[in-house]
Amino acid sequence: MKLSNELFHRSSKDHGGKSRICLDSSEDTYPPHSSSPPSFQKRLSFSDFSTTRLFSPPFLSKRSNNSPHRFSYSPPQHPASINSRRVASYTVQSSPSRTTYRQLPNEPQNSAAYTTYSSFPNALFDDFSPNNPLDTDPFLTSPGNKQNTVDSFRPLPETPVSPGGSLVHPLPRPPLPSSVSSHSSPYSTTSSTSLYSLYNDISLSCSPEPYLPLSPTRSPARTPSPIRLYSSDALRPQSPLSPSVEYLTPPNPYSLKSDISSTRQLPKIPVQDYASGKISSPLITRTHRRAQSETLFSSCREPWLVGKLYKWCKEEVFTALGGLVHEGVSRREVAQVMATLFTIHIASMEFLIAEIIAKNILGDWINYGLVEVINLEKLQIAFTSNEPPSGSGVLPFLTNGGCYSYICRSRSCPSKYQCYSCRCARNSSLEFTSLPGQSSDTWSIFWNISSLNSLPSSLSKREIARQNNIHELICKESDYVADLNTLAELFRDGIVQQQDAIVPSNRVADFIQSVFGNVESIRQLHSRLFLPQLIMRERLQGPVVSIIGDILLEWIHAAKSSYINYAKQFPLADETYKLECQRNTYFARWLAACRSDPRCRRLDFQHFLQRPTQRLQRYTLELDTILKHTEQSSWDFQLITQAVKELRATCEECDAVIATVLEANRIRDLSYQLLFKNHESVNLELRDPEREFFFEGIVQRRSDSRLDWLDIHLFLLDNYLIMAKARKDKRTNASRYVVSKRPIPLDLLVLSPKMDDFQLKSNTNKFLGSLAGNLPQESLTTKSKRKSKVNLELMFDATAEKNNENSMNSAVFEKSQLYPFTIRHLGAYTASYTLYVESLQLRKLWVEKINVAKKRHSQKINIKNPFALKVVSDVAFQYPPSDLVNGNEPLNSFNEITLVEGSSIDRALNEVAWKHPIVSEELLPEPIAYGDISCIAQFNDYEGHVSVLIATSTGIFLGAFGDSSDIRDWKKISSQRRVTQLGVVEEFDILLELRDKTLYAHKLSRIIEMGLIESKIAVVIGTPHAVSFFKIGKLSEGASVKRERTLVFYKEGLGNTTTIICCEPVIGLGHNYQKTYAFKRKDVTSFRTLDDFHVTANCHSIDCFKYSIALCHNKGIDVLRLDPKLAVGFPSPSVLNDTLFRNRINNSKPLGVFRIHDPSLFACCYQFGAVFVNGEGSMVNKECWFDWIGKPNSVTSCHGYLIAFNDEFVEIWNTRTRKLNQIIQGNDIKYYPSNSDWLANGKYIMFGMVHPQYHDRHLILALNKAKTNSFIIED
């Protein structure tokens, strides 16, 4: 790709009354010089334009052909003769809406119609007169003067050249009258030390010229293009400014919503009104901050003086933008204000050029310490306390109204001639024309730099490589913009503008929106903002570009949202166009025909559609290359580093967005493709917008007969793992998947940590199709196909196989290897599946994906969990040595349930790790007890804290439970063994202990004081060695006067005939009611038996209510009322009349009866599920029941939830909605009841399991009610 280097060279040509400036024009106003120019040894710098010099035309001077700035004119080429190589050209066109200095020959001269308000600084002084002889160019005569029309095409004089060959600039204007200060005039001949005179003695590699619009002089052939990108249109306001408005909120100068063919409409207002502050600027006022631009711009009447400009920006602009020293203001906003000031003083200057120059000025101020960067990420700057040196120089492009030509700045009537200066800022108008290109010149060829010039020798190899990289970035960006134009104009507009309907009219609008919806925003962003700024930066600073990171950083800030939106829609666009190709053959043929268009370069539509996503990734590579050749001490290095960082973050976000959309599309497809056998169905919740798709693939599984291999399509979602078999629909040939096994919820999915080595695939062998674990000594060499006869062949001898192992075909050997992994389905549908994949890497990938899915699922449901877990004890209690396998494993590793990251148990352990860290397994604290934990009791101590009693096979231990307690501080208070049950009656200061089937009553306060249980002074309740269990409850009695009584129920007897005895504590004489340890100290001397009940069944649990108790036995549930004495079966016979419930209840063990959220309803819990009945035992409706996920051993109720405990998991159900809310997985789970349905400050549900990290230790947990739950019900 070739880029034009003559941005500021102009020629004029008339086209039907319109003025056009084109590099290809054959009617150049200024013919080339015939004399050979002298040698030009060095590149122009600011030393050539000191404070006492004005602009001279360096590109029209006599220079040698070896000069890097040599200029050559080429005749216009016919379009047919233009090289077909893909090039990109940039032409310059004047804006038709702007006032000009030309008069067409056939138009009458009208001074009123062609009144031009001078925009150079002298127009502000009273003594300025356009008729002043000093303001007239002696070599150009106005066309209005008929006496001089013959000399109108007279060439301009050559720039004077000194005898030594160096360029000599024209003499400056004579000084102004003494009444005008020399500092206020741009023509003052007083020399002073300039800030920019530092460029005079610095080498070219360290002296960028950010303000000189230098450009190379080579002019390659240009190809006209219908694609025009008006950069100036996007950078200026689109509507005229109303002078009557005092405060304005203008459109963004970088707005991308303007029409592409519109031009910048400047207000027809004299520039003096801007400078005097009579009206407001259209670019300075922000939406949330009103700044009076009349005061702001009128305070800077001499913007060409660098010192005055810096003072104005520091004192006026920084304050007007609301900047704070510690926060700063946006560099872009300051640059826009400065650019607005420049365009006010030079009304015809392009805003893009003015803004780039303003940014270059700010960059130099940063380098010299006058401005500091507060926030590099947002490019926030602040002005320092440093001041520029006196006489810090001028800005030549603002002097003399933007041009040093007298006739250009002084004539008040229009002229048909362009200004001869290639750097005239008054006639700068940009129009970029771009065509795709296949090749590009290097930086040295582009700037016509040869090895004979002094420039390459003054630059290091690293800097030369950097300049090549920057130029390559601009070339590729031009190609990218051309491809975006092709996508928008050839394909999108072609579909709409085609006479024959390519896409049916009823869906063409949706098609355009789905495929091309976000193309235009990216196209406008690059063609109107990013690419023009890159080209302008290269022209203004070239051939050595000193800084480019600021443009990149501002671009990525503006482009981030557009690319994310494009990435979000890209999967839909790709799917839509492919579907249209399948069902619309005319559209497919049209796309194929478009490939012959030169703009397509034989590339298909898919290439252009995915161009933005691919280009975004390639930016990082190109910027990394530029960064590698950039000095780390430079400011540009910091800017590019920040741009690369944000670019990579944008790429990652785009990848995540695309992945999310692809997952959503795949889930949508699965909702139509999944089929269940035998009309079975599981609600997979595929319509849930939060559903996530993680992975899918084909695995193999042995058939139930273990004779065949089955291909299983595995789908991994964030809630289920689905195993299905692929099937083709015979009618539509669409893919369908028949679910072969019941989908596994991730809450019930267990991935076995133990994985065998690879196995050899074989259909049958003499062991009925079993697979060998490693390299087999005997294995089958042939496979039997399904429904074929079994072929048993001779086995290889082990020795022969070992000898021939190296000579085996590795491809065949690898193909027969399979790598297994095992998954388990917990619950009522418990099952284990061993799946096989073809490689070790694929097995690792599946394991990783399953763990990630379980982690993500745990994180999503954590906020919905009604209970959190608190650790009561982590490593204090150890399993008995007889239970340990291999020294330290108390469980089968094959059935082990591993810890899931982000689960409730993982969060509880992480919370403990902060307070009680364990550095390594070698530093694990020693256990305080060995043996199984039989029971746990809890009570409130004298400070109101919860204390816990834990009975093991080696004794009883006392500890504290709470946020401030030490979970490893346990005190042994008894060495008695065979303790099976503990209970506390806080009101009577009693601890009940069931040991060796004998029920003992101890004084709790004495145990706490002594730290020891004294068995000799304990009170025995009931018949020794005959008590099976006990239960503590508080019941009410009496019809008129309600009185609560604390009762103790215990069971005596064995076999089918048992007796339930009810007793209460008896308080002896001399009791006192002093509150000690939060107990009412009532000296209980004995227990009095109140009543007994004979049950002709084996009773195993008792549940107490306000007026009655429920007895659970092997024949069902009986409810006994104490006053009056009455027993009734529960639930009522009406429920048992239903065959469904009768079979379920009769074949299931009752686990308890609990009051739920509604006080009038009770939950009768069995091993199969729960049935909700009223006080009479009747069901409210047929839907008042549910089945457990597993087969629980015990059930309890807490805060309106039913909690069922299984050996491998805990399931928590909401009694209001009858839905499963939480599942907690674990190994060897055991529930430890409190043996009391009433405690003073409530009760905690405590249970234990094998520690998931240290398998020889007990982990005791307590359910803690979450604060986010909507209701709390006390039992």
Curated annotation (Swiss-Prot):
Annotated PH domain residues: 692-855
Coiled-coil residues: none
UniProt-listed CDD domains: RhoGEF
GO BP: division septum assembly; positive regulation of mitotic division septum assembly; regulation of cell wall organization or biogenesis; regulation of mitotic division septum assembly; small GTPase-mediated signal transduction
Subcellular location, principal: cytoplasm
Alphabetic keyword roster: Cell cycle, Cell division, Cytoplasm, Guanine-nucleotide releasing factor, Phosphoprotein, Septation
Biased composition annotated in UniProt, kind: Polar residues: 32-42, 80-113, 142-151
The protein's role, per its UniProt record: Stimulates the exchange of Rho1 GDP-bound form into GTP-bound form. Regulates, via interaction and activation of Rho1, beta-1,3-glucan biosynthesis and cell wall integrity during septation. Involved in the regulation of contractile ring assembly.
Name of the featured protein: Rho1 guanine nucleotide exchange factor 3
Species for this entry: Schizosaccharomyces pombe (strain 972 / ATCC 24843) (Fission yeast)
